[in-house]
Amino acid sequence: MAELATIARPYAEALFRAAPKGEAAGWAEQVAALGAVAADPVLRQFADSPKVAAQQVFDLVAGVTKQTLVPGVQNLLRAMIENGRLSALPEVAAQFHALVNASSGVSDAIVYSAFPIEPAALADLVATLEKRFGRRLSATVQLEPELIGGVRVVVGDEVLDTSVKARLEHMKVALTA
């Protein structure tokens, strides 16, 4: 994976420099959609075929996203296809997303919950977490029933675990010590 990260970095940085201020988040959505499409092994096998022209691969990938791509993102896709780097596109999307977040002072937060969280409750939770972590957060929720209750929040390399499962583990350690 380090090789893909090394290959992806110049593409992500060049795209970030090319993105107009205020439009980078929209570009990130388009690149993420392209990355999801490029992650498909059948598509990559098709793209690697010497019988397929670069324009055919471009048309297929751009068509599957069902979005009108801005010229800068189109140029990225063309360059990656022509250079045989389509397999690095998911990593380019991840690195570009990280650059956009870093420039806007936002961090990604993954909230693991045993149960679905209502939008209003999530907004309150995010406001509390932003105070706790000292930065703006972009939260996504993933269900994890084995937590029993509560939440576990991961922001970068920081973890806040207030789940029932974690509390039971702490009690187990305390009782067996």
Curated annotation (Swiss-Prot):
GO terms for molecular function: proton-transporting ATP synthase activity, rotational mechanism. It is found in: Cell inner membrane. InterPro entries: ATP_synth_OSCP/delta_N_sf, ATPase_OSCP/dsu. It holds the Pfam family OSCP. Keywords: ATP synthesis, Cell inner membrane, Cell membrane, CF(1), Hydrogen ion transport, Ion transport, Membrane, Transport. It is a peripheral membrane protein. GO terms for cellular component: plasma membrane; proton-transporting ATP synthase complex. NCBIfam families: ATP_synt_delta, PRK05758.2-2. Belongs to the ATPase delta chain family. F(1)F(0) ATP synthase produces ATP from ADP in the presence of a proton or sodium gradient. F-type ATPases consist of two structural domains, F(1) containing the extramembraneous catalytic core and F(0) containing the membrane proton channel, linked together by a central stalk and a peripheral stalk. During catalysis, ATP synthesis in the catalytic domain of F(1) is coupled via a rotary mechanism of the central stalk subunits to proton translocation. F-type ATPases have 2 components, F(1) - the catalytic core - and F(0) - the membrane proton channel. F(1) has five subunits: alpha(3), beta(3), gamma(1), delta(1), epsilon(1). CF(0) has four main subunits: a(1), b(1), b'(1) and c(10-14). The alpha and beta chains form an alternating ring which encloses part of the gamma chain. F(1) is attached to F(0) by a central stalk formed by the gamma and epsilon chains, while a peripheral stalk is formed by the delta, b and b' chains. PANTHER family: ATP SYNTHASE DELTA CHAIN. This is ATP synthase subunit delta. It comes from Methylibium petroleiphilum (strain ATCC BAA-1232 / LMG 22953 / PM1). The lineage of its organism: Bacteria, Pseudomonadati, Pseudomonadota, Betaproteobacteria, Burkholderiales. The gene is atpH.
